[in-house]
Amino acid sequence: YWNMQGSGKVKFDASAGFYDEWGDIPALEYKTKMNFIKIAKLKKGILYHLKIEQASDLKIPTKRLSLGYFYVQKNRIMRIWENNDYEAQGNVWTLSKKTLNRIIKTSEIPKYSTIVWQKKTYKDTLKHDKIDWHQYLKKIQDSPKKRLRYGGYYQYPQHSGYWETFIWEEGTGLIFYQSGYRDGVECIMLKRQGVKLPSDVWYD
């Protein structure tokens, strides 16, 4: 599911919408590249940092260009979380230099890290209105190839906050990514070029 053996770039079709200086959210479609940056070889796999390139016609906040750090192992992919402050982390998946150096030196992963791909799926175990980070990993039905979707969102008292989706395809790797707030505010959507997806791919 993870097709990169070293650092590299993969082409994606993208669309994004962010508030401009007039308070509007113009939608922009463009082409970009996903940077799979190899950080270190650990005991059970490789640590990568995923970043997308800045759009030329739209200023995407720098913190949203990073998808975070991923520990890629033979049987699973883990998203590295430094702590459990999901609300604060919502739109910036970064690691302190201290934590990153400790991971590289010891191969020990922070306990709050989460599995975004493995063969065994899982359901959200929290009550739907619980204020916390909700997540699941499920199979996508009626697909020509084996595909898995990871979804996560932060639940507030009256509505959901930040949310994101990853879709992985066997033999290809990451084919789709989307993140934003509530009803598509400050949204980024990425689709791997050459991959066909249904128009309603972001729905369950």
What do the predicted segments below correspond to?
Residues 1-204:
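Conserved functional acidic sites
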